[in-house]
Amino acid sequence: MVVTRARTRRLSLLETDSRPSTPQLDTVAELGTASPRATRRTRLNSSTLDVRTPTRTRRASLARGETPEPTTPSSVKRTARTPAKNTRSVRQQLTLTEEPEENEVKQEKPSPSPSPVPKEGKGKAQRKPSVSPSPGRTLTPNQQSDEKRVTRSMSQTPPMPTRSSSNTPRDLNDSPKVEQKAKPNIKTTPKVAVRLEKLSMDKFSGKKMEKAKPLIVPDELKDNGVVEEQNKSITEAHSQAPETHESAQPDKDAGKQSFLKSFTTLSKIQGSSKALHPDESADTITKITPTSTSKKIEENMDDVFETLRVESPKVERKIETLQKVHTVGTPEIKEKDEPVGVDNEIKTKTETPQKIEPPIIESKVETQQLIDHPQIEKKRDTPQNVSTVDLMDTSPEKDESMEDQEFLDAEDSIVQLEPQTDEPVEKPKELEFVDLDDDEPVFPSEAPKYVEDSKEVHPDDSMDDDKQNKIDVTEVIHLPSIRARAVRSPAVEQKKSVDFNNDTDDLEVEKKRFPKTPGREKVPVCRILTPKPETPLKLALQKGRNSSTPILKDQERGLSNSTEELHPAPPQIDAIKPFDELESKNAKDEMVEQSPMSKQKAENKILARLESFEEDVEDHGNEEENEEEHEEDKSISEFVDLEAEDAGKDYMSGDSMDSSLRREMEENEIPIDGESVGSKDTEESTPEESDGDDSFIVSDNEDEEDLGQLCYSSGEDEIEDAEESEQAERSSVKRRRIIIASPSDEEHDGKVQSNDDSSENKTEKPKNQSNCSSNASKLSEAAQLLNVSEEKSSISETELERSRQVALNELNKSERFNKTETQLDISVMEVDSSDHDEEEKTEKVGAKNNRSLYEIVDSDDGEEQDQDQSDADKPAESENHSEIKKSTSFMDQMSGAKGNKSVYEIMDSYETEDPKEAGKNEESDKDKPAENGKSDKDKQAETEMSDEDKPSEIKSPSTIKKSIISTADEEALLAELASSDLSHLEKMFNPLQKSRRQSLHVPSPELAAKNPKLRRRSERVEVGNDFCPSQSFVDMVAEKKRQKNKRKRLSKSLSGAPEDLEEMEIKHERKRLKSSHGASTDSMEEDNENETMTVAEEHHSDGEVSNGEVPIEEKPTTSSEKPSASELPEEEETVAVEELLMEKPKTCDSPRSEERPTEIVTSKPKGMAPVKVEKTAEYYLAYCHNLLEAANEAKLKEKKEHLASGAKQKKPKRIAAQAPSKLLGTIGSESETNTAKSSKQPPALKKDVKRLQAARQAVSHAVNLLAPPKATEAEPRTLSRKLSPQPPVVDKKSAKQKKGKKKQKPQEASPLKSSDEENHGHRIRTNAGYVTVVDEPPTKVPKIELIKTSSGMVRVEPCTPKQKYFRELPPTPKMHGFREEPGPSGMSRKRAKHAAPKVEHNSAKQAALRFKEQIFARRS
């Protein structure tokens, strides 16, 4: 049967039936045994309707041994109302538990009709087919005066007199109990009438329904013709049934007629109570079928009884018993049952019990239910369910004995009729033998089991017993009940129940077992929170750390170590036991304990050997803890003594880790200065793969030296050190990076000046080597170019220094704009590398290749990936070719001699924001031949410098060297970070965002490289001041933008409107031209245009978005600081910077900075002595402004980090917008005029606000195009992870900052005042007063880190685990044998962040479970 349909039928039939079954109370009242209102059923739900909820009265009566007559309807109801999962078992319970009581009550009067219906009732499977029997039940109330019983407090439908004739409703397949009652009343005389007593729904109905299901369907199939005949007979007997049932209770035929009449009434009532009964059709069918069955039974009682013997072996004994009793009533009921699927049994009973009267059956049901219920608990008193043939054979005997005990026979016959299963009826021996007389009061549900006893019991006696409600048990026949009936639950089972001996009964041999509804039965599940003694959590965390530390060899070691550690993870970290142990514990705690403990001990011994003695002690502690946990698993609240024993005096923070992990961490330990991607380490690993060294880690030795030099570039000393390190590196391995090229240059340079230059280059180059940064390569190569120019063009040292200064200035300019776009830096590097290439061609081809490789790295980093790849490929061939190709790609200038020019042009083409400088370079390059590339570049630089940088070029060589060294150190340090970051960032960005990766990839390395530049902001400011873009730069900007197909692609990919971006770039170029003139209004326009440009450039590249925004904004002074500040955050904050640009008007400042840097300060930073007083004043103002900006940018950087980490970005945007507006005003005024600063600041703020809004919109649009909704939050995280030299560290910092902020907010918001506004977030006003919401649990919980694992939430104890805590395992699931799922427990911990709420939630569950237990009379 489909549970839903069966339930609906039960609901419809059982409600009516339960009312018809209530009339049995009248019979019980006649018998005097029915407990008053014991049948009362609390109607919980339609689902519980089938399950006749044992009312406390019913339970009390059961405890008294009384079988409250309404119990049967209530049991039927319970089955109907039980939820779908429980319907099956509930149906079985219904049939046995309550109906036997009602059957007893009714068997006094209409026992013949109840017995057939109880048959169906017991076979709940029969309910499906016998939708018609439900009307039969409806008739029974009319038959019997039990209409009084109809009043049920629990009945969903109003109490119905038909319920008193629960015999007829028993016909209903929906209510097996009622059907059982009705069947014995109609078909069987008291002997044959099988009392449908509600055994505990769990025990009886579950098994009985299982058994009855096979009987029901086959019986329907077999007895469709019989059902038709029975329908006829029922229709005939339907009119007769009421009379017989009412007038002739002793007469079984009269009982049958009364049952039919009551059944007809019930059918009518059921038709009226369709709302209560989901299946009217089922009710109607049931009504029609039982009526016709009763009539036909009356007509063909004997014939059908014989037929039933033959057809259904289970029914045979019942049929004979019914014949003895009065087969007229019972056979009709059985025929009614035939439509239900008990058709064979119905036929048998229809033939046999012609005498059956509902009263007799009821008396039998009650008396025998008391007596037989133990038998039903024994699982089958009536062999009907087991083997109908045997029952048929014994039925005549039973009928004789049941003549003595008519009521017993009626009940037994009913029971026999109902079990329509093929199981042998004679499993009662397996069942515990229960004397009906002895157990009768205590176990009314077993009455059907005693139906086999009805063989010995005489039908006359059963008739008398029906009247008297007392059963004389001549023989106690133990028929196998459907389910093992546990006598132990008398409250439910005391009601006599008809057990259907079905195949399921054979399957379920345990008769005494208290049957739980299969849905209800819950296998005790092993503890799901099974902490593994050695949790891999720490190992996984350490693996993450190792992955964050990018040293390959160390990582490989770490991986091998981690794999080794996975098996024996240090148990000290977590004393949590593995699932295997815990699950095995639930099965057998102690046994499982010992085996895993032994395993743990073995592992702990190994670990102790590998690790320190403290770890071994901790392992023993863990074992003890595991034992404690095993012992405590039984208890609800488990004390998890995860506390590792005190590590001891010698315990170090890393001792708990495996020796391999500790070793790995020590080897990979990051120096305080930070790990550097040193040329030495990279050379050791792979000299030629220096380009491929994408690890964030900086080289250990030389990078540290380089960092020292960069930070403390004092000049020649550091240069000498750098030379030594470079020579060693050069000698050790040739690298693609410039470092090797610079040593080659140094080797080639035999001159002291060339050595000095090469020493400067070395100072720059080791940095470049370690960082592979375009800036470092630019500086070192620029110095090398100067040296080569000295060698080739025989220029004086001063000229070389001037050329170096020019190159450095250009590099600085390119860096300024490279902040926005790394292409400038790349071009600078390439320019230097091209010069170096010429030098290297003259000097060394291998050095050229190394340089070219390094330049390739920078070009890959600085340039967009398309050209970077081509450059990387071509420079590998030769720097000149790669640079020439670059120049052809960008500048369309192909000449090996013009390699310097082409490099500068490449720089210009790469310089999106430095296009002024690039333009100058290109123009100067075009104007001057590139035969002496370096000398030409020096001249070009001088031409550029001649505008503003000549004084700096005129600087003394020592001053030039110092400036070059300082800038070179600064830029080399930045270049190291940038270079190391660039290749790694390329790899990082490429998988996630190809378009972005290109754009972000170019700027982000420089940003990473520029992060350390903050140390030398002053020098950077000077470098920025040295850069003076000329108006030709604006032309070059236009050319660059036009020639920047890659950036256009980036803009297309990022902003999605490349053409618009190109137009915006053109506008930006125009505005930059205007800004180059230096008009304040132009600068303001340029700010707007620069914002658009920054947006466009940001679209070009995410890294460029951040860089472009700030670098464009950067003035000569601002450019030095902002590039440093912006470069530091840019890697992490590429998106954050975009947002900040949207927020800030710095973009407005950047055009001004660009315009005025060219105008104001270009040579000053390198020209130690300012050439112009105005420039010096502006320089100082710009320097102060840079300091202010540095502070602002530091704050902004923090905010950007928060943004990158995913912190709320709106707030940082607001802050950024406010701060930048101030910066914009200050910057604009400073760039325009020192005095005009303050005056221009407010208008700049207004314009900046508008610009900020426009920029924000553009940037937000671009960001949205780049990444849908998560662009602000998710992108910064990914970008920070990708761009940051050590993204995990940044993420950790950002996450910590977020956590700190969250913690601080509750602390700040802690309500000190009662006002709702101040404390509104944490203070809630209620009628009782103000409720303060305290975030204490989150503050406490973070101490113990919760990690979600397959076992659930695992608490990670601190490195020195000393905390003991109670892990409250919810007692409810374990106590009730429910599976404890980690999900709910983990969720509760997450929600409440402490285990207490789990118990609270479980308390509700416990209450519900207890309620269900009470309702279903069994433990859930």
UniProtKB/Swiss-Prot annotation:
Subcellular location: Nucleus, Nucleolus
Distribution of this protein across tissues and organs: Present in all examined cell types, including neuroblasts, ganglion mother cells, neurons, imaginal disk, epithelial cells, germline cells and embryonic cells. Present at high level in cells with high proliferation rates, such as neuroblasts and nurse cells. In the brain, it is observed at higher level in neuroblasts, ganglion mother cells and young neurons. Detected at high level in all neurons of 3-day-old adult brains (at protein level).
One of the record's GO cellular component terms: nucleus
Bias-annotated ranges (Low complexity): 284-294
Main location: nucleus
Disruption phenotype: viable but sterile. The mushroom body (MB), a functional center for learning and memory, exhibits abnormally thin axonal lobes. In neuroblasts, the nucleolus is packed more tightly, forming a dense sphere, and the nucleolar proteins such as fibrillarin and Nop60B are abnormally distributed in the interphase nucleolus.
Modification Phosphoserine occurs at: 12, 18, 21, 35, 46, 61, 75, 111, 113, 115, 130, 132, 134, 145, 153, 155, 175, 233, 312, 395, 401, 413, 454, 462, 547-548, 560, 562, 595, 612, 635, 637, 653, 656, 659-660, 742, 744, 754, 758-759, 789, 794, 796, 827, 833-834, 852, 859, 870, 889, 902, 946, 952, 956, 999, 1004, 1032, 1051, 1053, 1055, 1150, 1153, 1229, 1310, 1314-1315
Basic and acidic residues: bias regions: 171-182, 221-231, 243-255, 332-354, 449-468, 577-591, 600-612, 871-886, 913-953, 1141-1158
Region spans: Disordered: 1-194, 221-300, 329-405, 434-468, 533-778, 827-962, 993-1023, 1038-1169, 1200-1333, 1364-1405
Function text: Required for the correct organization of the nucleolus during development.
Protein name: Protein slender lobes
Organism: Drosophila melanogaster (Fruit fly)
Gene label: sle
